UniProtKB/Swiss-Prot annotation:
Protein name: Polynucleotide 5'-hydroxyl-kinase GRC3
The keyword Nucleotide-binding appears for this protein: yes
Primary location class: nucleus
Keyword annotations: ATP-binding, Kinase, Nucleotide-binding, Nucleus, rRNA processing, Transferase
Gene assigned in the entry: GRC3
Amino acid sequence: MSDDFVVPTYEVGGSDSGSDQDISDIEEGSFNGISATPLPTADVEYVSEASPMDATASLGYLSGAEGANLYVAREGANYFNDAANKAVVLCLHSYEQLAISGVFKLQVMKGGITYNSIHYNCGLHTYDFWHPLSESIPPIAASFAADWEEHSYGLSPWLPADIKEEYECILRISEGSNIGDVGRLMAELGQLWTRHTGCTFSILRPEDYARPLILNKDWDNLQAELMIHHMNSEHDMRVMCIGGKNSGKSTLLRLLLQKFLHGNKSTTKATGVSHEADVVNYLDMDPGQPEYSAPDSISWSKLTSETLSLGQHLAQGHREMIQTTYIGSSTPQTWPEMYLTAMEHIIHKWEMEGQMNTALLNLPGWIKGFGITIINKAMELFKPTHIIFLTHGGKLISKELVVPNMFETMQKGKYKPMIYNLQAFTQHNIPGLPAQDPRYHAANIRSFRLLAHLHRLSEQSYYPGPLLSSPPLQVSFGSQGIMAFRFLQDPSSGYHQDDISAALQGCVVCLYHSKMPPDIDMCGVFPMLKHSADYTSMDFVTLALIHSIDVERKFMNIYIPGHVSGRVHSLKNNFVLVRGATDLPLCELYPQKLLSSSYRNREIPYVSFSKRKKYEYVWKIRKNVRRRGHYNK
């Protein structure tokens, strides 16, 4: 980290876009209250496009009086370099708020902080924060320690004594992972985390127009009420959130997860470490915008209070993955039957293990057509104790959506679900305020998640260059190594043997492991998984990228993420390779660096620098075919 403190000037930009992006702000006073009554029969069909709301409702921009409280770094006064720990020390008064973009680790050495309405005391624990510029960034508010006595942990001896006395809150900020290097492979996402290179985080100034995540009282009240149920529940608690696109569904679940795991942490005075870790089960059924799943996949994972990653980590946060199923597409509509089967398999496995902890269910923001089928099926399987509807203007979601009056489980017996109607977020274009940044739409964010998955070397390290610049792994197929292939486009193995190699090279595939040799039918030299075989019951390993295939010698060159390479080597055989519809980002095949003039004379896979002549291979054949209108004359 450089000794010279530089805070870059940021371009004006928005947040949240795409098929189900999170909220950036919640309008104050836009909801009249929380109701806990059974859902009545719907009278109107819910429209995903939000109805107009009060245009004078203030969005959460940090300006005016709020901007005056934003922390501004002054080196030598409230900002110090901690070279020994490769970090910086920030000193804040109790009324100041800190806005940071990027990936970083935070330790509260003195006082406390408030983040998303949750208070954190000083201690030895370090928290991981992920704040991409595509999302609204929650402010970190300085506060006092919630204790009768003042404590401090790890304060550097070189820090002036008057500084320690003057400031109520002192933080140590250190660098996080180098995931920003992955984003720079795409021209659109080069500044997804910070606006400059050289550091994984950046302190935002008031003039940078930082968009804080501001919640109204109704959202806070809902979190507080559900927190009481979480603490007092004698059995398991099951929370299900239903909402359309851009309704704030994913953000609400993320806030509830933080509330459940960090909202009631007691710490010891000696170390500042919590007494015990709480656990929450997260059933992630949204393949298009997953919170913890691999790209184009659904999963069940466990989150603990000790390792929870804060902010929007874009599926890179800490978790214990229990079950993952590759769907092969970012939308369940591509293979609907397979999606419903996979969802049922995951929820059934979670149910059979008798989990007594709180569980959160994340569904796609699809509330029309087949989306209602997904919601009804998920409700039947999950049997929620608490259901949250994010609606616009109090409109009910659908006539076809009917919530049962009673559910029954082995742990709780029969029970009536509690239903909450909450005002969803609606985006407004207000004159004079920055518009949505088009670079951060849903397709680009999905591409980033895939790049991050393929380039991940370890928990905190990512391969910064294109995969083509590194050697692939050679894996045999047939009698060892990869022992079966499956194409989701044609499960009956109707591909010709000469086309299989071409259909796999340069494509993203999923690698599964079977405990027993799979049932196959040979198609030339390729063993094809039988149509009756169910690969979703096998163990998910990783997504991978096939570089090339040597049919004669029966091996393929394949790129496997570094963080799972050890597991792949230990398993060795009985792998099943599944080809879906996952698209590889163009920057992986055609990196801008390899297209520069210095690489023009090199042989690069998939890239040709030869330029054809004008009109070469251009055929304009006139077809004397009568159009439909000709028959009417």
